[in-house]
From Swiss-Prot:
Organism: Arabidopsis thaliana
Transmembrane segments: 416-436, 455-475
Protein name: Magnesium transporter MRS2-3
Miscellaneous information on this protein: Has the ability to complement a mutant in yeast lacking magnesium transport capability.
Tissue specificity: Expressed in the whole plant.
Motif stretch (Required for magnesium transport activity): 437-439
Amino acid sequence: MRGARPDEFNFSTNPSTPNTGQPTPTYPAGVGGGGGGRKKGVGVRTWLVLNSSGQSEPKEEGKHSIMRRTGLPARDLRILDPLLSYPSTVLGRERAIVINLEHIKAIITAQEVLLLNSKDPSVSPFIDELQRRILCHHHATKPQEEQNSGGEPHTRVDPAQGEAGTEQSSGDQGSEAKKDAKQSLENQDGSKVLPFEFVALEACLEAASSSLEHEALRLELEAHPALDKLTSKISTLNLERVRQIKSRLVAITGRVQKVRDELEHLLDDDEDMAEMYLTEKLAQKLEDSSNSSMNESDTFEVDLPQGDEDDRLPPEFASEANRDGRYLQANDAHELLMSTQSALSRNSRGTHTSSTRSAMTNKLDVEELEMLLEAYFVQIDGILNKLSTLREYVDDTEDYINIMLDDKQNHLLQMGVMLTTATLVMSAFIAVAGVFGMNITIELFTDNKHGPSRFIWTVIGGSIGSICLYVGAIGWCKYKRLLE
């Protein structure tokens, strides 16, 4: 047999020792290799954890720890990364809901809420409001939980009822977890209480919509005076203010539009809304686990030996079995087969009933979530309509300013035409003076008696002729509607 090469079993952790063909072992921060002076691991951030009773606790968790805790993939956690620019997103997963709305970056599970940027000053009011809502939800569901868990008598089986009573008690215990989960969602007065994840989701949606609405209102209050001032006086300062307002308007309109599109996408897809029922899915898992344990117990009862089967018989049948043991042995195979068939049929009926009830409940729950999302969809749509109205007002102001500038430009062009016409007439008069200024001998220059008077009449006649030419040119332009 060929021997192994020396470097195949080289597992040395010394960095100076080469280890070809094997991956270099890596150590976390502070473990080995002088890691005591290194920073904490990459991806470790401070999360504020709010449990179902309203208590908050900051924890430093890494990416992999959050993935194990919430069951989310790495790409979903990347959405919450503050260093990356992701649009507003609401994702429903198997065990958690990912919320990335404006300044709110959170992960909602069936029992807790994890906030990423809890130290942000803009998030502090949201944390207080979320704690208040969670406390109200906890106080609303706590009496029912105490009533369901405390002082409830256990179901006793009458020995005279035999196996039927045992099967009935097992079936009741199979759906006990789901009944408790359903009863915990009802208030003392019988009114419906939203699940924990919907309470947190509603708080996130309300905080995001309120933030957008306040920003839109503040922008509207700043925009109207600036636009009115620009209308009355066009200046560089007013134009700069309107330009900044328009840039902010475009930015906030895009953000509101993204939130609206996200809510509309959720409302159009019932499967995505069904994924957000974390409490329902958790109760369903508990029911499935109880059903599986019940199935195992039924299978175990079917496979019991002959002595145990005799012990499980009711009293009136036990006496008959003692009197006629041979009859019981002859029908042992038949009874075993019938008990197996009854167990299988009972399990199939329970599974069918559970699935039917779950489907009907999911339909009602999706309708309930749809009503919740529609309320905030209408609010976001109203904010978008306000921004659209403000955008139209800005566009109308721009059109009005352009009309004013065009009117001023037309006046400047008319003035240019009038000045050009006057210059042309003056050029004609100067041409007459130039003709008389030529150095030639004529009779007018040699007449000493009538020379000055003729000069005066020539100047007066040239001026009157120039004025007549100017008036005629302006009249022709107005006739052709070149001038107003």
